[in-house]
Regions:
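Terminal transmembrane helical anchor/hairpin motif
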Residues: 126-193
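Juxtamembrane "helix-exit" motif on the non-cytosolic side of transmembrane helices
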Residues: 18-27, 67-79, 103, 125-136
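A structural motif at transmembrane helix-loop-helix junctions in multipass membrane proteins
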Residues: 93-136
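Secretory targeting signals
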Residues: 60-106
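Canonical alpha-helical transmembrane segments
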Residues: 37-55, 94-103
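Alpha-helical transmembrane segments of multi-pass membrane transporters/translocases
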Residues: 9-17, 169-212
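Alpha-helical transmembrane segments of polytopic membrane proteins
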Residues: 4-7, 26-41, 80-92, 110-120, ...
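Alpha-helical transmembrane segments
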Residues: 2-19, 56-67, 199
Length: 215
């Protein structure tokens, strides 16, 4: 028996926000929630693709659920208001990439979602090697490159968080040695909309590929 689509999507929505109540330190709950959402958005999109376009209610619901809290009341993100909209667009784009992947191969959606989650974790851990390689394991140029391709950097910087100076990155990833000529934070005003456009393009390609595969 297949689950009701709204119940299924509610589970995907809830998993995206599950980190917030689990944080022992409320001061870190805001950033921790956005970190997890940046990793979960693409896999959630892949799984939501099973419900068709209805699956897009998940990122919209995330945006609606967090907007009141982000407006100065979410611990760890005080003052991050208008920028949250750009982070929401970035999350929508990551979700769209996953949704397109899922539509392209519906039968493999579970496997593909797991692969996207592992890929996101890898990209997020690369700048500091997950803390296993000692402080600053890469050259400043490589660290800058790895920060650029991390979904965590994208979403948090779109939200207005100074991620390069966050304790999780500043010393462990050697961000203190990265010259501004090597890397500047993502500007949410263009990075958020561009990520959403990329997600929409990936979704369209996934629909076309899936239709051809089933024909």
């Amino acid at each position: 028996m297949r689950p009701h689509p709204f119940l299924y999507l509610a589970v995907l929505f809830g998993l995206g926000l599950a980190v917030y109540p689990l944080c022992a330190d409320s001061r870190r709950a805001g950033v921790s929630t956005l970190i997890w959402l940046s990793l979960w958005a693409a896999p959630a999109g892949t799984l939501a693709a099973r419900t068709g376009l209805l699956g897009w209610v998940v990122p919209v619901a995330w945006l609606l659920a967090l907007t009141p809290a982000i407006g100065g009341r979410l611990p760890g993100l005080v003052g991050v208001r208008f920028e949250w909209a750009y982070a929401g667009l970035a999350l929508g784009g990551l979700f769209g990439v996953g949704w397109g992947v899922g539509r392209a191969r519906l039968r493999l959606s579970m496997t593909l979602a797991a692969a996207l989650l592992l890929l996101g974790l890898l990209l997020a851990a690369l700048p500091s090697l997950g803390g296993l390689g000692g402080p600053a394991p890469w050259s400043p140029a490589l660290s800058a490159c790895f920060l650029d391709i991390s979904p965590v950097s994208l979403v948090l910087e779109c939200a207005g968080v100074d991620w390069m100076r966050h304790p999780a990155v500043y010393t462990p990833a050697g961000a203190d040695s990265i010259d501004p000529l090597l890397r500047l934070p993502w500007a949410g005003s263009w990075a958020g909309p561009c990520t959403l456009l990329l997600g929409c393009l990936a979704s369209w390609i996934g629909i076309q590929y899936g239709a051809r595969s089933s024909a």
